[in-house]
Amino acid sequence: MKITVLSLFENFFNEFKNTSIIKKAIANNLVDIEIVNFRNFSKDSHNKVDDTPYGGGAGMVLTLQPIVDAINHVKTSNSKVVLLTPSGKTYNQQIANQFKTFEHLILICGHYEGFDERIINYVDYEISIGDYILTGGEIAAMAILDSVIRLIPNVISVNSLESESFDNNLLDYPNYTKPYNFNGYKVPEVLLSGNHKEINKVRKEWQINKTKINRKDLFIKYLKEN
């Protein structure tokens, strides 16, 4: 899989690409991450990529020409283009699972006051990572990169993926490790029993209860589908 990020801040991704699972995935040729600065495609004599908004208003708006030319430069017939914007559809695990099937994913990071609205004519998806505002789309891009890359076969173990949060609309069950007793807080006895059938049963109950308390929206989905 190849993922191209269009950004004004290439250096933002240097440490990300050289850390942990992402670094291993790149080294093992499981994913190719390309960072492209769309300022390099500006035809303005001063390499400007923004301008004042029509109708007035605060801030500067990203102009179409550099971004569209950058898209056309990296895009192939197998590419899917994603605009990272607070007005997009909220990102979730289902979308991550969809994105991992694409041969080439292009993520567009905004900045300043945002994009010229006409950019939507050049993208396949408009995605938001939540109801809050960031200075730019780079953090959102890294969230999507991480969540998609870890789903690529052989990046992490299948067993780890099968028991994660959001599987079947349930949060993950609580995990415990040594020591057994920490300041009076003890590991539930059932986990020490060796009875895996009972452990699996209790863990499922914990998942349901945790989801019901912390994520009522997911719990409602779970009830509808089970």
UniProtKB/Swiss-Prot annotation:
Its EC number is 2.1.1.228. S-adenosyl-L-methionine binds at residues 110, 129-134. It is found in: Cytoplasm. The keyword Cell membrane does not apply. It is an enzyme of class 2 (transferase). Keywords: Cytoplasm, Methyltransferase, S-adenosyl-L-methionine, Transferase, tRNA processing. One of its GO terms (biological process) is tRNA N1-guanine methylation. GO terms for molecular function: tRNA (guanine(37)-N1)-methyltransferase activity. InterPro entries: Alpha/beta_knot_MTases, tRNA_m1G_MeTrfase_C_sf, tRNA_m1G_MeTrfase_TrmD, tRNA_m1G_MTases_N, tRNA_MeTrfase_TRMD/TRM10. Gene3D superfamilies: 3.40.1280.10, tRNA(m1g37)methyltransferase, domain 2. GO terms for cellular component: cytosol. Specifically methylates guanosine-37 in various tRNAs. Belongs to the RNA methyltransferase TrmD family. This is tRNA (guanine-N(1)-)-methyltransferase. It comes from Malacoplasma penetrans (strain HF-2) (Mycoplasma penetrans).
